[in-house]
Amino acid sequence: MAKQIKYGEEARRALERGVNAVADTVKVTLGPRGRNVVLDKKYGSPTVTNDGVTIAREIELEDPFENQGAQLLKEVATKTNDVAGDGTTTATLLAQAMVREGLKNLAAGANPMLLRRGIAKAVDAAVEGLKRISKPIDNKESIAHVASISAADEEIGNLIAEAMDKVGKDGVITVEESKTLGTTLEVVEGMQFDRGYISPYMVTDAEKMEAVLEEPVILITDKKLSNIQDLLPLLEQVVQHGKKLLIIADDVEGEALATLVVNKLRGTFTCVAVKAPGFGDRRKEMLQDIAILTGGQVISEELGYDLKDVRLDMLGRARQVKVTKENTTIVGGAGDAAEIKKRVNQIKAQIEETTSDYDREKLQERLAKLAGGVAVIQAGAATETELKEKKHRIEDALAATKAAVEEGIVPGGGIALLNVIEDVQKVVDSLDGDFKTGAKIVLRALEEPVRQIAANAGVDGSVIVEKIKAAKDPNFGYDAYKEEFTDMFKAGIVDPTKVTRTALQNAASIASMILTTEAVVVDVPEKNTAMPNPGAGMDMM
């Protein structure tokens, strides 16, 4: 396919137009008085959102050169979202500011490679400054503040803080769509997996259609059970000791299933059978997790165990097991705390090493099931459009809160970036020539978020920036919601350090790429040839 090429200033200006198209659309959403953007959907209702990355992903430009700039800026938003889960609008805005300032200097004859090194040096200083002013987050109130700021909703903030309080920082918190108008929190204690009873005849509560076993023993095996002879020695021990039995197996069918059901109906013993969770190697790992949590052993021929030789002390134990048609929940597993901790650390190490997002998500789920539990936030709203928007906000707030727990918090409202100007200024003073000019580009960009938050609130950004700088108080800032100057920490206006840091680093990375670009190559658009008119005698469809 033929290509079009643009060089030098012409290429960079085309990229800048693409950058501006994305940034100008995204930046109107910044701050508590930021506006929404309506996204057209081919099918169904339009999406109304103020989430930077969602908006950026929707933008495709007609001009192929400008579109390259737009795609590069999308990369800033997407990468920031992947790493920190929030701060995509800030990242987009910072990148736009750096590109704008950088291109001015290039037009005046600056060396792009020296500018790039200057930008990198200044960003390193700013990141160190952010670490210096960051405060650890350790109480429910601080978590609620972070979540409330991100979601722009106090109720959601409190729900997220409560969810984190219940399941711990390693716990899994998921967001689902509710059928009701309100937004609620549901917490599942213990380990839950998405497999229900194999036969409905195994329920202990016919009204609720669920089986609840108090103090049961748990057989964990990767075998398919169809022959009752394999199970008889174990069942005799279970009946002798008057225990209730939960069987977690690859499958239970045929004669084995029929015998278990008949004995349950006769009242000989209480038994519930469920299929093992997961698939393939993940299934083996999850069975091992359940075994460690309940203090049992996985009965597997690979490990040299035969079902006929199973003793009662090889089975897992728990305070309670609840089995519904779709889920099994094990509460109060009798596993050794040290062994569970060892397993948790092993999974954490795997999370660090994996490069697959899917694997990471599955490992996080396993970690949560071992470490604490699962919380589900049910998002409710009056219309489908509002529901989508609310779910987006909750997911963003959740990601921001996790980032805050990880690396701490800094004053919000763009103030943290103003606070590190002194750190960057020291670097600027130590440099000269185009190296210095590159560092100055970052210096100017650091003011941009405060200016934009103020502009979205309808006030002059430059005046606000100068007032904050003159105050010399690191926590002094502008509350755009109440339209007043205040102590940001006391007012609960905080941002996660990780979000601010990631936004700045990713913005600088893409800006440097654009500034050092000397040519852009794109495909020549194909000409759509119009279909010929149907000839005489042809039927019109």
From Swiss-Prot:
A Gene Ontology term for the protein's cellular component:
cytoplasm
Q: Kindly state which keywords UniProt assigns to this record, in alphabetical order.
A: ATP-binding, Chaperone, Cytoplasm, Isomerase, Nucleotide-binding
From the UniProt record, give one GO term of the biological process aspect.
protein refolding
Tell me what reaction this enzyme catalyses.
ATP + H2O + a folded polypeptide = ADP + phosphate + an unfolded polypeptide
Residues that coordinate or bind ATP: 29-32, 86-90, 413, 495
- MF GO annotations: ATP binding; ATP-dependent protein folding chaperone; isomerase activity; unfolded protein binding
Q: What is its main location?
A: cytoplasm
Listed transmembrane segments:
none
Query: Any keyword ATP-binding?
Result: yes
Q: Which SUPFAM superfamilies match?
A: GroEL apical domain-like (SSF52029), GroEL equatorial domain-like (SSF48592), GroEL-intermediate domain like (SSF54849)
Enzyme Commission (EC) number: 5.6.1.7
| Chaperone keyword on record | yes
Using the UniProt record, name the top-level EC class of this enzyme in a single word: isomerase
Q: Where in the cell is it found?
A: Cytoplasm
Say which family it is in: Belongs to the chaperonin (HSP60) family.
> What is annotated about its quaternary structure and interactions?
Forms a cylinder of 14 subunits composed of two heptameric rings stacked back-to-back. Interacts with the co-chaperonin GroES.
What does the record give as the function of this protein?
Together with its co-chaperonin GroES, plays an essential role in assisting protein folding. The GroEL-GroES system forms a nano-cage that allows encapsulation of the non-native substrate proteins and provides a physical environment optimized to promote and accelerate protein folding.
Which NCBIfam families does the entry mention?
A: GroEL, PRK00013.1, PRK12849.1, PRK12850.1, PRK12851.1
Protein name in the entry: Chaperonin GroEL
Gene, per the UniProt record: groEL
